[in-house]
Regions:
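Non-catalytic amphipathic alpha-helical adaptor/oligomerization segments
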Residues: 1-132, 136-144, 153-156
Length: 156
């Protein structure tokens, strides 16, 4: 999955997470019920769509909108407090970091708020904000992949 994301293989990355995150048969095959990493797969699914951004994707939805749909399916994830903490730390390295954080809840990580911040960066062609969004997204992927590795390697 990491390799696919690094080479812009969003469709291929999507095909990997779909059976783990969608309960119905799809073109990628039957669903894989009761996966220990189901919640993480939903989280990955949402992030793949966030990377689609303003592009039209699955089911005629734009990436940002589809990301919000999948974050809704994911619900709360125990990584959210760590993501919020790290996102705040990353913002300290940016001149407009406090402004960036004003769009994000200080109480709890809201992935939809961050998705809309990414959308704003693209819409306004704000290169510095886009750089911040990419840095936070990369951190988020890193935490999520660590979590998936921990979950799948602890299953015996």
């Amino acid at each position: 999955m990491v390799l696919l994301l690094n080479i812009q293989g969003l469709d291929e990355a999507h095909d990997i997470v779909l059976p783990y995150s969608w309960p119905l048969p799809a073109f990628t095959g039957p669903p894989i019920p009761n996966s220990p990493a189901c919640k993480e797969s939903q989280y990955c699914h949402a992030m793949v769509h966030r990377l689609e951004g303003p592009n039209l994707g699955e089911l005629g939805m734009y990436g940002y909108d589809n990301a919000c749909f999948w974050f809704g399916k994911t619900g709360y994830h125990h990584l959210f407090p760590k993501v919020l903490k790290r996102c705040t730390e990353i913002a300290e390295n940016y001149e407009d970091g406090k402004t960036y954080l004003s769009y994000i809840s200080k109480e709890a990580w809201n992935p939809d708020d961050f998705t809309m911040l990414c959308k704003k960066a693209i819409a306004n062609n704000d290169k510095e904000l886009w750089k911040y969004c990419n840095e936070v997204t990369n951190m988020e992927w890193h935490l999520l992949f660590q979590e998936c590795n921990k979950i799948t390697n602890s299953v015996r």
